[in-house]
Structure formats: structure tokens, C-alpha cells
């Protein structure tokens, strides 16, 4: 019975297998390199058969694929087995959800930097990333039925970081960070796209109310009385005119130039115009500054209007536009 392989040796073999089957697949190799590749493939296959129990799943795949199984994501090299890489930093676990079932603020492919990576495993992995109002999810592709990882954006911030790479994507990198929490680092396809992701993340940490969380005034909140009066104070020009029709008095009003004894008793009812006033409606009296108006009724005083007569014409008069003619 063959001794069990140490875990780090199994990891190395898996990385080497992935490197040969995936990374070298698209390379143009010399005849000597191809021969060496075939030797390595044979030796790896022999080792896996010698430890069939430990590599049972991989062995089954070898038989089906004539050698080595191709990874589901060409950029994600031997990453799916590393469960620790995908676990949330705080130990929280979030319900599995399909990528297509999420309502998101932004979604798209990014390159995610691995927390730990080996010599053969790629440092950057292609991931379908989804930012919601409060969560960040990442998947192998936009068709995945469950996320590879997720974390709450509560407390997190985002910023550009041009020190993560030294290649053409140097200015396309950004990171999501928070005090005492894991830092997540990504690379977009362009600096503009990276900045858009940063802005979306910065605005998705619960600071923006959703459509169902619009801000409304509290109907139970007590309103300061003085403030309420300021809001609803009626100005003369905005005062509501009475809707009740005015009945023309049967008695003839005392004319202005009347010198009879009645004038001496009606001084209090004589007013003069403070400003020019043009009636907007037929039942409103028009007058100019200084015109004499005889007030017939103050029935609509609460509305800011009186009933007056001038030169035989009767109509509504805004009381704020007239003043007493005599100081009695």
C-alpha cells in the first residue's frame, strides 16, 4: 500500500497538471519541449493511478477526457479547490443565489486578485462580479447558479490603486477595504470602468434609499407652531377671496360729497386707497391711490376682504390696500 501523499504535494501536482493542460495548451512548443511535456503527463498520470483513492475524482475525469480535465474557467487556474480563498473573512456565510437572480447596481467581468496563489496558479482570476445595494458577489461566470464568494459592503470603502500590477492594467486596479477586514482587489478592463466600479461601491453602502425606502415626512411628528404659522401665513395678494355672492344693499350708500348730517356719523366707514388696485374679477372693485371708498360691510373680514362702494360701483375691496380716511 502506497503511503498517503502530503497535502502540499497533492496541491503541487494539481497545479502542475493545470499548468501543462491549460497554460501550455496555447503555447507554441519546440519538439524537445513537446517530448518533455508528454513525459510529465505520463508521470503525473502514473502517480494519480498509484494513489487512486486520493485522486478518485481526478482519475475519473482523466478517463473521460483522455488525460487531464480542463478547468471551467481558463483564467481561474486550479483555484476552485482552494476553499479558504473564497470564504468570507468574518466567517459569515450567505445564502447561495444564482447570478441571474440578483437585482444589481452594476455587474460585469473583473479580474480578482487571489489572496494566496502558488507558482503555477494565476494570481488574478476572471470573475463575474455583481454589486447590489448592500452586497458584493463574485461568480465564475454570469451563468453560475451559486456564487464563489460574497461579502457585505457594510463598512467597506473603495479606491483606485495603481500599485497592484505592473503591466498594461496598472491604472485599471481598485480595491475594496475596511478596517480589520479582508481587502478585496480587482482589475477592470479600463481605468474608466474601474472608476465607475469605485463610484458604484461608494454609493451602495446603504447611503442611498432604494425605491421602496423613499424618505417621507413623519405624519406623527409634531410641527413647531410658530414654524407652521410662518408657512401658512396669508399675504394680502394671496388671500383667498370669498366665494359667497354679494347681495347689493337695497339702501343707497352715502355719497362721498354728501354734506348731510349722516356724513358726520359715518366717518369711520370712509377709507382711501393706499395703492392702485385692479380687480381680477367682475365682483372686485378697482381703485387708485387716494380714491375714497365707502365701506358697506365687513362680513368677509376673515378672508381679508370688505364690501365697498366708489362712485356708484360696489365690489370686494382687499382691506390691506386701504386705510381710514379720518382719524376719529
Swiss-Prot record:
Source organism superkingdom: Eukaryota
This protein's GO cellular component annotations are: cytoplasm
Composition-biased stretches (Basic and acidic residues): 238-248
The record places domain PH at 103-206
Q: Cite the SMART domains for this sequence.
A: PH (SM00233), SH3 (SM00326)
What residue ranges carry the coiled-coil annotation? none
Entry keyword Iron: no
Q: Gene3D superfamilies in the record, alphabetically?
A: 6.10.250.220, Pleckstrin-homology domain (PH domain)/Phosphotyrosine-binding domain (PTB), SH3 Domains
Which segments constitute the SH3 domain? 266-327
Q: Which UniProt keywords apply?
A: B-cell activation, Cytoplasm, Phosphoprotein, SH3 domain
- What PROSITE patterns does the annotation carry? PH_DOMAIN (PS50003), SH3 (PS50002)
Where does the record place it?
Cytoplasm
Which InterPro entries did the record assign?
A: PH-like_dom_sf, PH_domain, SH3-like_dom_sf, SH3_domain, SKAP_fam
PTMs per UniProt: Phosphorylated on tyrosines.
User: Does the entry feature the keyword Phosphoprotein, yes or no?
Assistant: yes
Provide the residue span(s) of the region labelled Disordered.
Answer: 231-262
Matching entries from CDD domains are given as:
PH_Skap-hom_Skap2, SH3_SKAP2
SUPFAM superfamilies documented for this protein: PH domain-like, SH3-domain
**Protein family (similarity comment):** Belongs to the SKAP family.
Q: What function does this protein fulfil?
A: May be involved in B-cell and macrophage adhesion processes. May play a role in src signaling pathway.
Q: What is this protein called?
A: Src kinase-associated phosphoprotein 2
**Gene source species:** Xenopus tropicalis (Western clawed frog)
Q: Which gene encodes it?
A: skap2
Amino acid at each position: 500500500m502506497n503511503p498517503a501523499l502530503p497535502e502540499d504535494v497533492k496541491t503541487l501536482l494539481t497545479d502542475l497538471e493545470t499548468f501543462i493542460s491549460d497554460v501550455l495548451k496555447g503555447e507554441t512548443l519546440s519538439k524537445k519541449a513537446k517530448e518533455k511535456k508528454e513525459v510529465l503527463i505520463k508521470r503525473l498520470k502514473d502517480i494519480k493511478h498509484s494513489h487512486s483513492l486520493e485522486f478518485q475524482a481526478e482519475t475519473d475525469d482523466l478517463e473521460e477526457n483522455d488525460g487531464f480535465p480542463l478547468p471551467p474557467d481558463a483564467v481561474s487556474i486550479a483555484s476552485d479547490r482552494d476553499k479558504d480563498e473564497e470564504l468570507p473573512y468574518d466567517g459569515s456565510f450567505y445564502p447561495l443565489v444564482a447570478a441571474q437572480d440578483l437585482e444589481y447596481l452594476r455587474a460585469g467581468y473583473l479580474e480578482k486578485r487571489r489572496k494566496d496563489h502558488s507558482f503555477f496558479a494565476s494570481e488574478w482570476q476572471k470573475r463575474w462580479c455583481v454589486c447590489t445595494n448592500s452586497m458584493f458577489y463574485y461568480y465564475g461566470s454570469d451563468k453560475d447558479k451559486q456564487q464563489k464568494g460574497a461579502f457585505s459592503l457594510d463598512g467597506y470603502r473603495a479606491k483606485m490603486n495603481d500599485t497592484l500590477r505592473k503591466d498594461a492594467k496598472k491604472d485599471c486596479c481598485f480595491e475594496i477595504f475596511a478596517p480589520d477586514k479582508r481587502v478585496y482587489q480587482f482589475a477592470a478592463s479600463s481605468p474608466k470602468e474601474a472608476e465607475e466600479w469605485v463610484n458604484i461601491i461608494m454609493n451602495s453602502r446603504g447611503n442611498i434609499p432604494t425605491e421602496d425606502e423613499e424618505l417621507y415626512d413623519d405624519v406623527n411628528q409634531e410641527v413647531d407652531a410658530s414654524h407652521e404659522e410662518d408657512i401658512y401665513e396669508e399675504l394680502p395678494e394671496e388671500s383667498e377671496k370669498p366665494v359667497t355672492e354679494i347681495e347689493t344693499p337695497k339702501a343707497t350708500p352715502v355719497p362721498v360729497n354728501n354734506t348731510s348730517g349722516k356724513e358726520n356719523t359715518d366717518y369711520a366707514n370712509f377709507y382711501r386707497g393706499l395703492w392702485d388696485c385692479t380687480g381680477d374679477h367682475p365682483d372686485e372693485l378697482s381703485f387708485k391711490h387716494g380714491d375714497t371708498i365707502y365701506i358697506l360691510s365687513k362680513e368677509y373680514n376673515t378672508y381679508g376682504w370688505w364690501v365697498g362702494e366708489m362712485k356708484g360701483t360696489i365690489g370686494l375691496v382687499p382691506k390691506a390696500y386701504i386705510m381710514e380716511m379720518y382719524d376719529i
